[in-house]
């Protein structure tokens, strides 16, 4: 009797929904990102799960606010994930 789903080759969407420890290959959910300030356009490196308020170095504008998990970016801020 064949299985209904392939356990060795799960789809990427299934893997993303699983807990970080129960994935086929374990990896964390957090990452570093470059955040561009909407006022002075300087780029700052911010941790995705920052636990403190992060302000811009140039103009002291708040870039992100901590929440229970991921940090919430301020409106107007753009970001991209840093590559390894």
From Swiss-Prot:
It is found in: Cytoplasm. Its cofactor is Zn(2+). The keyword Ribosomal protein applies. A zinc finger (C4-type) spans 37-59. GO terms for biological process: translation. InterPro entries: Ribosomal_eS27 (IPR000592), Ribosomal_eS27_Zn-bd_dom_sf (IPR023407), Ribosomal_zn-bd (IPR011332). Gene3D superfamilies: Zn-binding ribosomal proteins. Keywords: Cytoplasm, Metal-binding, Ribonucleoprotein, Ribosomal protein, Zinc, Zinc-finger. Its main location: cytoplasm. It comes from the Eukaryota. Binds 1 zinc ion per subunit. It holds the Pfam family Ribosomal_S27e. One of its GO terms (cellular component) is cytoplasm. Component of the small ribosomal subunit. Belongs to the eukaryotic ribosomal protein eS27 family. Component of the small ribosomal subunit. The ribosome is a large ribonucleoprotein complex responsible for the synthesis of proteins in the cell. Required for proper rRNA processing and maturation of 18S rRNAs. This is Small ribosomal subunit protein eS27. The lineage of its organism: Eukaryota, Metazoa, Ecdysozoa, Arthropoda, Crustacea. The gene is RPS27.
